[in-house]
Amino acid sequence: MVDNAERMPFRDGELDVVTSTFLFHELPSRARQSVAREMLRVLKPGGLLVVLDSAQLVESTELRIFLENFAASMNEPFFASYLREPLERLFGAEGFSLRETATCFPSKLVVAAKPSG
């Protein structure tokens, strides 16, 4: 589906799974919060969120120079703030329960669930 991730055309609790591939680093911080909130809204209780995106500074200090240079060299206006705002913290703040994280350089995978109750 291609649509506005901040206002998805689904009812509350309609979906079992929501996925995102390389979206969050393209968004300003405020939009990342809004999209995470919207993902929670459309998921059924116990539903899963699966996100694949660029690695962040929390994954490895060894990657810092590579990741910070990437933003400048690839004209990524929101990448610098994305690097410093861990997705795990974002999803937790919006109400998700973290299930799994994995680093697959230069990417990260985050799996979280909407609480059942």
Residue spans for each PLM region:
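Conserved Rossmann-like nucleotide-binding pocket used by diverse enzymes
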Residues: 1, 19, 50
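Conserved SAM/SAH-binding loop
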Residues: 2-7, 106
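A short acidic, Gly/Pro-enriched loop at the edge of an enzyme's catalytic core
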Residues: 6-18
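A short SAM/SAH-binding and catalytic strip from SAM-dependent methyltransferases
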Residues: 16-30
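C-terminal alpha-helical "lid/dimerization" subdomain adjacent to the S-adenosyl-L-methionine
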Residues: 33, 48-109
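A short glycine-rich, Lys/Arg-flanked "PGG" loop and its adjoining helix->strand segment in the class I
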Residues: 33-45
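C-terminal lobe and adjacent flexible extensions of AdoMet/dcAdoMet transferase-like proteins
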Residues: 110-117
